[in-house]
A protein has these predicted regions:
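Glycine-rich flexible loops
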Residues: 1-271
Length: 271
């Protein structure tokens, strides 16, 4: 058996949940390649990651749009947790509002129980008073500034897609048309890029690159709306699971270049 301990039940559960996730991830990674562990330098880099110090403000009013986004985001976060796409404290969701501000999930709040009032409003680079937003807030802000077509961002750690993040095996979405239409040409960036090279990470996204994978870290999916980004997250995990399962049967036959061109033409996909 396994025994874990911490100062409270939440801490102990979080450790156990993470332990189980890592074990399953290693098993799946071994099915497609050789898992790559973090170096001591990378561990120290992650540990030195600073929390963004933002000025605070007190919102004068919460609009009906904002309230609706808060409710929808909680619903999607709970759904992602039930599907094991995120963990109790791992996984960041954000949604841009029509005035350019955005709502983001808080730091260190259990994703299984997060409520609308827990979510954090970021406006003009300032943080809603009395709340602690995700450590990736600046990355979300930069992506929104660089890409007016992006209105929602999700950072997650799903078991199957992460098998590609911890190995040197490339993720290829050309399995079935839906996978390619949703995910197009996913890019892989080095560990730590999302907080040491924020601008470069943000500039990696494009209509043909809606998903970025960070080595030994996470995946980032973007969309025109929260449900659109969530669809991409689900499709990415389903596709990764299919590839890993099929790899045990033989060579995988991907959609060829001519078929890809036809899909791009028929569905008016942009570069």
């Amino acid at each position: 058996g396994v025994v874990v301990g911490d100062k409270d039940m939440f801490g102990a559960f979080m450790i156990f949940e993470t332990f189980e996730h890592c074990a399953k991830l290693q098993v799946d990674a071994l099915r497609i390649g050789q898992p790559r562990g973090l170096t001591q330098q990378q561990i120290e880099l992650s540990g030195s990651r600073s929390y963004p110090m933002l000025e605070t403000f007190v919102p004068k009013v919460h609009t009906s749009e904002e309230k609706a986004v808060r409710r929808e985001m909680c619903h999607m976060v709970h759904r992602a947790y039930r599907q094991r796409l995120i963990g109790s404290t791992q996984g960041t969701f954000s949604q841009r509002l029509s005035d350019g501000s955005f709502i983001i999930t808080p730091y260190w709040v259990d994703r299984a129980y997060v409520e609308p009032e827990d979510l954090v409003l970021i406006k003009n680079g300032r943080c809603e008073d009395g709340k602690k937003p995700s450590r990736s807030t600046i990355l979300h802000k930069t992506i929104y500034e660089k890409h007016p077509e992006i209105n929602s961002i999700i950072i997650a750690y799903p078991q199957y897609i992460m098998a590609f993040a911890v190995t040197d095996v490339d993720f290829d979405a050309r399995t079935i048309p839906e996978s390619y239409i949703q995910l197009r040409n996913a890019k892989k960036l080095p560990f730590g890029y999302s907080f040491t090279n924020i601008l470069e990470t943000a500039e990696t996204f494009a209509p043909s690159v809606p998903m970025v994978m960070l080595e030994n870290d996470s995946i980032i999916v973007t969309g025109s709306s929260l449900i659109n980004a969530f669809d991409k997250l689900e499709v990415a995990e389903f596709t990764a699971r299919s590839i890993i399962s099929c790899s045990q049967l033989g060579d995988i036959v991907m959609i060829n270049d001519e078929e890809v061109k036809q899909i791009e033409k028929d569905f008016h996909l942009e570069d």
